Amino acid sequence: MRLEGKVAVITGGGNGLGRATACRFAREGAKVVVADIVDDLGQETVQLVTEEGGAASFVHCDAVSTSDNHAMAAHALDAYGAIDVLVTAAGVSHAGYKSGDQEASVKWFAKRVDYFENPANELLDLDLDDFRQVMAINLDGTLLAAQACVPAMIESG
């Protein structure tokens, strides 16, 4: 078990890469903090981890919320006493995306079927506010999670 005794905080842990990472890290011995904006999905990941004998807890976290990120770090420290690993898997590919909302994603893509024939149209027609929302989640979310968690990681060595 390569992560025995380590504490891993994983944003976007409710599905996709975040969920897979949480499950794998737990199998490797880590205690896992699953953070996600969709509570039900985050709780499902915790259930998957604990059913396999791992240790996990859930905390609600909107990746672009400074206060949510600090609450996430505080939760990890309260629950497990340290933060050793941070994985920022929270991310989206389009502004209409909401983690776990497959129906909304399908509707979003259905409106853009014609773009798949000429992908340049998506770029040329992309609304700047939509682009900024995607970048905020994907990039700002990583920065905010690091700002919240890295001080504890440095402190614990």
Feature-to-residue mapping (PLM):
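Catalytic Tyr-X3-Lys loop
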Residues: 103-143
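Rossmann-fold scaffold of SDR-type NAD(P)-dependent oxidoreductases
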Residues: 11-12, 83-91, 99, 107-117, ...
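A glycine-rich helix->loop->beta "capping" turn
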Residues: 52-55, 75-86, 94, 119-127
